[in-house]
Amino acid sequence: MAQHDENVVWHPHPVTVAQREQLHGHRGVVLWFTGLSGSGKSTVAGALEEALYQQGVSTYLLDGDNVRHGLCSDLGFSDDDRKENIRRVGEVASLMADAGLVVLTAFISPHRAERQMVRERVGHDRFIEVFVDTPLAICETRDPKGLYKKARAGELKNFTGIDAVYEAPESPQIHLDGQQLVTNLVSQLLDLLRQDDIIRS
């Protein structure tokens, strides 16, 4: 908190997180999907959200492109702006988890320090790092937005995986092979969520 905000105090809620979770019938957590552009983060997160919705789970998906239309529309792609982008998303995701939602986030989030920042904000027991591990060559072949082509041509600077580093998670809670079928990956995720008692069997 900034020094000039010292008179701003936190007001406790009369309804607790546990009460909200009881109302929803499941825990409030953040599944943080990370991986290269084109790895399948948004696709897998979206398919998982649909599957959870069909099971009556209260969810919300925060997507890297979507938040830049509103919440982070004032930010560019400098290192400082990228860090602020992740900080803001982490704050929103934490609030949503407090509300008892299963929050799915799909962000490249290339730096371990930034992902750790969000983990500490959300809480280690509510933050689940999901690494969608897809080889760069496969991501380039997919290239759904044509970004790799632009980066290779020098038209797009500071692009993760080409001229900007991606720091892969060292010990993610969930490690997915991004070359598998999406249906298989969703099944793996649902099994893990049940095993960890986040959603009901």
Curated annotation (Swiss-Prot):
Q: Which UniProt keywords apply?
A: ATP-binding, Kinase, Nucleotide-binding, Phosphoprotein, Transferase
Under Enzyme Commission nomenclature, its number is 2.7.1.25
Task: Tell me yes or no: is Nucleotide-binding among this UniProt entry's keywords.
Answer: yes
Q: Among the record's GO biological process terms, what is one?
A: sulfate assimilation
Has the keyword Nucleotide-binding been applied to this entry? yes
Q: Which molecular-function annotations from GO does this UniProt entry contain?
A: adenylylsulfate kinase activity; ATP binding
Q: What is the top EC class of this enzyme, as a single word?
A: transferase
Q: Which InterPro entries match?
A: APS_kinase, P-loop_NTPase
Q: Which Pfam families has this protein been placed in?
A: APS_kinase
Q: Any idea which residues are catalytic in this one?
A: 109 (phosphoserine intermediate)
Q: Where along the chain is ATP bound?
A: 35-42
Catalytic activity entry: adenosine 5'-phosphosulfate + ATP = 3'-phosphoadenylyl sulfate + ADP + H(+)
Tell me the pathway: Sulfur metabolism; hydrogen sulfide biosynthesis; sulfite from sulfate: step 2/3
The family this protein is said to belong to? Belongs to the APS kinase family.
| Known role | Catalyzes the synthesis of activated sulfate.
Protein name according to UniProt? Adenylyl-sulfate kinase
This protein's species is Enterobacter sp. (strain 638)
Starting at the broadest rank, the lineage of the source organism is: Bacteria, Pseudomonadati, Pseudomonadota, Gammaproteobacteria, Enterobacterales
